[in-house]
């Protein structure tokens, strides 16, 4: 019989282990008539033995003595505990009686200690408490175990009471001591049975002697019979010998009995008359003797096998024998009847008792819901039935009362915590008074089994209660499991008896865990259905309705998670289980609901569902998926959210891309080019644009898209649109800057003669000249000055405020781009896409788009030219290069003008775009810009031109620069570099394009600004200015004051221009302008100090054109295009100017750029000139010969050993590459070889100044051959082992 609980209605069929059941012990099908009959006989037996029917004579002749004290009432017995039961005093030694009495007395003292009201007064109570603690003290255990006489117990208490009284000040302490000892003796006598008459007699004598004032106890082994007072009625008169009438009205407890069994008086009277003859003392005593006989033969209701030890069995056996003897003392009147027919004591006494007590409890609790309040009538049936039917052993009656409650008032399916707790309290306080009885695991097997069966019944109720609470898990008011669980763990799991049934407990728990999960699933299903029904009440299902449904589900899960943070029964995580079930219930309909909402939107509005609404739906579904995967890691969500909602993300991305360019365009149209505030000098459009792009990317990130590749693609598209818009923005800013700098008057310069003080003003006659052509003033100044003039600083150029705002915008954009890059991380985006393509064997993302919509970007670098045609009297030209795309019929750009040179160096970059795969024919033209006043309105002169066709098939699409040179017509060579990059839908490429565009624009704008006062810098560092200091021949020794006075106008002029800029530019930009101006100063000083290195070739060519006679007549050591070498005095004057400008003007005690940036590499190279300038030609040549091998080693390092350019990952194309790929090559630390090469160049230039043109030309020719050799070797090396990777892959 596999049962899990004790009631017939609560069974678990799938538990394979046998579960203790009340039905296995108690006959729950017992007819009520049997209970009725035995209970009626019990009442009648007690009725005929009431004191009013007793004769006023000595009690039992068998014992030869009787107690002086009358039996305590039933209420008193209940209040103070059980009596010791001894059949005959001779059956047990007095020592055994004393030890048994101490055990029962201990429980009685415990009750009094816990309730002060049970003691006569506080003094008595304190002594009782002290005695009780002494009995608990392990150190006193040996003393109590050795006690063999009751007088020893009384004497021990006397000492305790005496010691307590000594602590207090009491007048009659002697009388108080006697009173307390007498009270204690009464407690002991109350425990002893009538069969212990000798011991009781001695205690009574001791008590009488106390009243007489005696202080010693006389120990007597024998005692004469004591007289017993007559029983008196309530009125105090002596009871006469009455006979029972057996009338219902005369029988005690009959009214309660009729209510208990719902019978009428007539029928009851008939039943009384029918059974009264069976309710006699002889019959009852005969049945008691039969029970005693069976117990003595070890064949009673319990046997030794039911106990854990013989000692425990003997304790029970002695207890029963003593109690039976006690009953026989009361009921036996001399007549003996042999009876074992169970006429008074039921054969199945336990089942009858349980049914009876069940009826009593139902009646008593009919008006009380949360407590068991027993009346005196009820207590009569509790205790009389247990005593007369011999089931009053503490463990037995406890388990039976528990069973009766479970089969009656606690018979509901769910747990009644208040009544159950009250029941446990009644059992502990009334039946398990002694601590030895409180542990059910120490009980006999039958009682332990029945107790366990009741616990399983309560377990079943607890589990059903929890199961019912689980049905309300999704309600607004969350169910509270803690009261049930607290009761369950403290009273059931914590009960020691459950250790004997651990297997059964595990099986039951497993069953209920399984059932709980089913209940949770059903609750989740019902909850979702209710939500769905609410949603379907609307006319149409909209996406917002579906989103609200999912949000409600998420909130419900979170509410459960917040409320229940501990597993139910340490097994079920309610938040996890509810989340799994609720998600799975919703998941089966999730996609259909979304599709229905999409169709509904199309039907109502005629348009597709908006991307924002759809992505909001994705957001909540993503959160639900995250919850589901957290609670079920190995689970699979119901459909791929990203693959379904990607169409909406794509639409949103397209909208954002269009909006990006729209915002940039509108920002330009509404811009007034005014600073944002006094501290920030840039305009509002910069902030608006970056606010827009940050919000755009943040909006995508806000959705938390879980497909990294898809998100990277979308951001890439937005960055491409951003790149296109920003390139347009950069171009328009640069156009405005050029327009501003082209407008306005050119500055006019004045020279005052030292003799006449007359001044000459030279103004620009054509203020609207072409934007790329600079002032023609320098040659005019040089031709006009006929004496030693004094230079006067002109008025500063009036830069427009708008120009400065535009420049600030360019710089601020670069700064914000760096911040945006850290946030957007384009390198990671590109890497994600590349890894996806690699893992899926797809082509490069940039090539997956239609080539017709893509562009190719050419970066053209104009480096310099050689041997171009000269136009001035000195054979020099003021040259610039213009470039035009003949294929697209579009101007590419124009370089700055390099004055007075046939070997100009421009080193400028230009970018142009072309349709993908289209060749471009570029026309390069070098012009001479004359400064002559007579040609102000004339066209510029042509120095040379050349064509070059760039075909994408012949250029590597990797962004690496390729050197090429063009032979000019009619003469000269132009040196350039070209690099090609194909436009790609790539984050790194897009950001790199923006940065390079703005970086180039900013640098070009700075150059244009600095060029506005470049002519005066060139004039200040000229031979004309030197003549004012050192004379026409450079031999005059001028004072330091004269040297500094000569350059002072330049100080004033630069200061005036920079002050204008300082008020409108940021410090960062101002320093950049100052450093560019300083480099311009160094360039002019360098040209003044030494002839250019390529002038050796020019002089050789010109010498070859002269006749022998002309060369012989030329006695002056002049260099073509440079003039005579400077004297030592002139050299010193120039370096004094440089030092003054560097330290006093530009650095200005830390107010300007740092000295480390001012004393740059260029400056350090110029400082080499004085070290070699005064050396002889032979010494210089020897130094050159020493350096030639080092220069060869330098070339091998530069072309073959230098770290090759490779771009991978983040370095591939991020905005940190600055201007362009070629300009962003990682520079190696400057090594000694490179330094030696610079030294060699300086020495060669000095040799040119000393007239060693042939020697220098030969050295340069050998170096050129060596360079070509190294380039060829590098080309071969790269062909064998490619090192240049694509810049953005």
Swiss-Prot record:
Domain MHD1: start-end pairs: 615-733
Region (Disordered): 745-774
Keyword Magnesium among record annotations: no
Record localization: Cytoplasm
Keyword Cytoplasm carried by entry: yes
Keywords per UniProt: Cytoplasm
Domain C2: 834-966
InterPro entries listed in its UniProt record: C2_dom, C2_domain_sf, Glucose_resp_signaling, Munc13_1, Munc13_dom-2
GO cellular component entries: cytoplasm
Residue span(s) of domain MHD2: 1044-1184
Family matches, as Pfam families: C2
Compositionally biased tracts (Low complexity): 748-762
Extra remark beyond the main annotation: Present with 300 molecules/cell in log phase SD medium.
UniProt name for this protein: Uncharacterized protein YOR296W
Organism: Saccharomyces cerevisiae (strain ATCC 204508 / S288c) (Baker's yeast)
């Amino acid at each position: 019989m596999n049962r899990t609980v004790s009631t017939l209605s609560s069974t678990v069929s799938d538990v394979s282990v046998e579960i203790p059941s009340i039905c296995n012990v108690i006959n729950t099908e017992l007819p009520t008539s049997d209970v009725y009959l035995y209970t009626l006989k019990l009442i009648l037996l007690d009725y005929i033995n009431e004191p009013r029917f007793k004769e006023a004579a000595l009690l039992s002749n068998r014992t030869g003595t009787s107690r002086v004290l009358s039996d305590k009432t039933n209420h008193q017995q209940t209040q103070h505990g059980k009596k010791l039961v001894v059949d005959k005093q001779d059956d047990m030694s007095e020592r055994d009686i004393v030890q048994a009495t101490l055990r029962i007395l201990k429980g009685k003292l415990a009750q009094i200690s816990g309730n002060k009201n049970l003691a006569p007064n506080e003094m008595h109570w304190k002594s009782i408490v002290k005695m009780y603690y002494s009995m608990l003290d392990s150190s006193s255990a040996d003393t109590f175990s050795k006690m063999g006489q009751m007088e020893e117990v009384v004497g021990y208490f006397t000492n305790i009471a005496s010691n307590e009284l000594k602590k207090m000040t009491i007048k009659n302490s002697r009388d108080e001591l006697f009173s307390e000892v007498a009270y204690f003796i009464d407690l002991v006598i109350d425990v002893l049975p009538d069969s212990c008459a000798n011991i009781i007699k001695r205690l009574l004598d001791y008590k009488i002697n106390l009243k007489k004032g005696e202080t010693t106890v006389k120990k007597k082994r024998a005692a004469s019979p004591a007289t017993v007072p007559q029983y008196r009625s309530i009125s105090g008169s002596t009871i006469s010998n009455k006979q029972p009438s057996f009338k219902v009205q005369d029988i005690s407890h009959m009214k309660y009995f009729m209510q208990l069994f719902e019978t009428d008086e007539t029928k009851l009277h008939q039943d009384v008359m029918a059974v009264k003859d069976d309710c006699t003392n002889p019959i009852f005593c005969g049945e008691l003797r039969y029970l005693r006989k069976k117990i003595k033969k070890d064949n009673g209701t319990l046997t030794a096998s039911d106990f854990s030890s013989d000692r425990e069995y003997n304790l029970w056996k002695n207890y029963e024998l003593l109690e039976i003897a006690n009953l026989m003392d009361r009921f036996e009147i001399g007549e003996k009847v042999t009876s074992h027919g169970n006429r008074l004591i039921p054969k199945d006494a336990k089942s009858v008792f349980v049914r009876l007590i069940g009826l009593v409890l139902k009646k008593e609790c009919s008006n009380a819901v949360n407590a068991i309040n027993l009346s005196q009538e009820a207590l009569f049936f509790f205790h009389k039935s247990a005593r007369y039917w011999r089931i009053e052993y503490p463990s037995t009656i406890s388990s039976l009362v528990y069973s009766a409650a479970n089969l009656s008032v606690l018979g509901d399916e769910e747990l009644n915590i208040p009544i159950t707790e009250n029941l446990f309290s009644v059992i502990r306080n009334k039946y398990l008074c002694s601590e030895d009885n409180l542990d059910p695991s120490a009980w006999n097997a039958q009682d332990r089994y029945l107790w366990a069966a009741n616990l399983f019944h309560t377990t079943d109720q607890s589990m059903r209660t929890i199961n019912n609470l689980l049905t309300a898990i999704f309600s607004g008011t969350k169910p509270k499991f803690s009261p049930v669980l607290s009761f369950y763990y403290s009273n059931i799991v914590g009960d020691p008896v459950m250790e004997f049934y651990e297997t059964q407990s595990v099986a039951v728990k497993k069953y209920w865990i399984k059932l709980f999960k089913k209940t949770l699933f059903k609750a989740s299903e019902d909850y979702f259905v209710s939500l769905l029904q609410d949603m379907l009440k609307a006319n149409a299902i909209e996406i917002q309705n579906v989103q609200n449904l999912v949000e409600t589900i998420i909130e419900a899960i979170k509410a459960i998670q917040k409320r229940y943070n501990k597993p139910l029964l340490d097994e079920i995580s309610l938040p996890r289980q509810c989340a799994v079930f609720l998600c799975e219930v919703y998941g089966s309909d999730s996609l259909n609901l979304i599709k229905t909402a999409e169709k509904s939107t199309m039907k109502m509005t005629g348009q597709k569902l908006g991307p924002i609404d759809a992505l909001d739906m994705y957001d909540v579904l993503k959160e639900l998926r995250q919850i589901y995967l957290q609670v079920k890691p190995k689970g699979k969500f119901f459909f791929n959210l990203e693959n379904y909602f990607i169409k909406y993300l794509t639409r949103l991305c397209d909208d954002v891309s269009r909006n990006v360019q729209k915002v940039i365009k509108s920002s330009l149209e509404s811009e007034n080019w005014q600073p944002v505030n006094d501290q920030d000098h840039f305009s509002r459009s910069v902030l608006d644009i970056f606010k827009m792009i940050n919000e755009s990317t943040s909006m995508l990130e806000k959705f938390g898209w879980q497909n990294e590749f898809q998100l990277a693609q979308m951001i890439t598209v937005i960055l491409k649109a951003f790149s296109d818009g920003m390139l347009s923005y950069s171009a328009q800013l640069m156009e405005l800057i050029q327009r501003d700098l082209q407008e306005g008057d050119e500055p006019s310069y004045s020279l005052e003669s030292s003799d006449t003080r007359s001044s000459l003003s030279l103004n620009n006659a054509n203020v609207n000249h072409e934007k790329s052509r600079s002032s023609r003033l320098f040659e005019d100044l040089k031709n006009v000055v006929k004496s030693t003039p004094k230079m006067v600083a002109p008025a500063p150029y009036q830069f427009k405020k708008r120009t400065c705002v535009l420049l600030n915008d360019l710089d601020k954009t670069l700064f914000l781009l760096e911040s945006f890059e850290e946030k957007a991380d384009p390198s990671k985006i590109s890497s994600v896409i590349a890894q996806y393509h690699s893992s899926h064997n797809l082509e490069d993302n940039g090539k997956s788009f239609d080539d017709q919509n893509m562009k190719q970007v050419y970066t053209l670098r104009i480096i310099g030219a050689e041997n171009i045609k000269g136009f001035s009297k000195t054979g020099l030209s003021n040259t610039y290069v213009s470039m035009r795309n003949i294929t697209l019929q579009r101007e590419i750009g124009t370089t700055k003008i390099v004055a007075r040179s046939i070997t100009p160096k421009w080193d400028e970059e230009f970018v142009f775009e072309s349709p993908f795969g289209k060749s471009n024919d570029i026309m390069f033209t070098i012009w001479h810009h004359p400064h002559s006043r007579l040609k102000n309105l004339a066209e510029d002169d042509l120095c040379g031109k050349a064509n070059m066709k760039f075909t994408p098939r012949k250029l590597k699409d990797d962004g690496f620069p390729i050197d090429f040179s063009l032979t000019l017509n009619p003469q000269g060579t132009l040196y350039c570099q070209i690099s090609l990059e194909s436009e790609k839908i790539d984050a790194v490429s897009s950001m790199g394009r923006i940065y390079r565009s703005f970086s180039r624009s900013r640098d070009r704008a700075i150059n244009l600004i600095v060029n506005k006062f470049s002519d005066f810098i060139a004039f200040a560092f000229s031979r004309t200015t030197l003549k004012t200091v050192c004379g026409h021949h450079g031999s005059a020794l001028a004072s330091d004051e004269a040297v500094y006075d000569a350059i002072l106008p330049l100080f004033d002029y630069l200061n005036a221009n920079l002050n204008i800029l300082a008020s409108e530019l940021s410090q960062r930009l101002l320093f950049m302008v100052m450093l560019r101006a300083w480099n311009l100063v160094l360039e002019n000083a360098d040209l003044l100090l030494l002839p250019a290195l390529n002038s050796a070739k020019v002089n050789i060519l010109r010498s070859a054109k002269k006749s022998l006679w002309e060369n012989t007549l030329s006695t002056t050591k002049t260099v073509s295009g440079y003039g005579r070498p400077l004297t030592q005095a002139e050299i010193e004057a120039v370096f004094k100017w440089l030092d003054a400008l560097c330290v006093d003007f530009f650095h200005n005690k830390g107010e300007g750029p740092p000295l480390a940036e001012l004393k740059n590499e260029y400056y350090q190279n110029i400082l080499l000139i004085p070290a070699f300038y005064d050396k002889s030609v032979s010494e210089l040549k020897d130094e050159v010969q020493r350096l030639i091998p080092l220069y060869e080693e330098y070339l091998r390092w530069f072309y073959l050993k230098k770290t090759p350019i490779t771009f991978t990952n983040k370095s591939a194309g991020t905005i940190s590459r600055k201007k362009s790929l070629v300009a962003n090559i990682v520079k190696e630390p400057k090594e000694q070889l490179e330094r030696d090469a610079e030294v060699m160049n300086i020495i060669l230039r000095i040799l040119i100044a000393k007239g060693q043109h042939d020697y220098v030309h030969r050295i340069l020719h050998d170096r050129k051959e060596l360079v070509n050799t190294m380039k060829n070797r590098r080309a071969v090396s790269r062909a064998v082992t490619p090192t240049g990777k694509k810049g953005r892959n």
